[in-house]
């Protein structure tokens, strides 16, 4: 896991709460607007990837 990223509490597609570190983080914003930050996570149980919104203060 990358050391620069911090774990975020997310809900996995299986419906469980887990503290995971996103594999990739990006901003999703229309031109000239604030937008949101999205993270790509991997479900530790199923191995499937899913996206989840991140807090606004999360470093990219």
Curated annotation (Swiss-Prot):
Cytoplasm found in the keyword field: yes
A GO term, aspect molecular function: double-stranded DNA binding
Modified residues (N6-methyllysine): 16
Post-translational modification: Methylated at multiple sites, to varying extents. At least one methylation occurs on Lys-16.
Keyword annotations from UniProtKB, A to Z: Chromosome, Cytoplasm, DNA-binding, Methylation
Domain of life, source organism: Archaea
GO cellular component, one term: chromosome
Broad class of the protein's primary localization: cytoplasm
Subcellular location: Chromosome; Cytoplasm
Keyword Repeat on entry: no
Family statement drawn from the similarity comment of this UniProt entry: Belongs to the Cren7 family.
Function noted in UniProt: A chromatin protein, binds double-stranded DNA without sequence specificity. Constrains negative DNA supercoils.
Subunit structure: Monomer.
Listed name of the protein: Chromatin protein Cren7
Lineage of origin: Archaea, Thermoproteota, Thermoprotei, Sulfolobales, Sulfolobaceae
């Amino acid at each position: 896991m990358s050391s620069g990223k911090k774990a975020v509490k997310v809900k996995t597609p299986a419906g469980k709460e887990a503290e995971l570190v996103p594999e990739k983080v990006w901003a999703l914003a229309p031109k000239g607007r604030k937008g949101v930050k999205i993270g790509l996570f991997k479900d530790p149980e199923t191995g499937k990837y899913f996206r989840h919104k991140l807090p606004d203060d999360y470093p990219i």
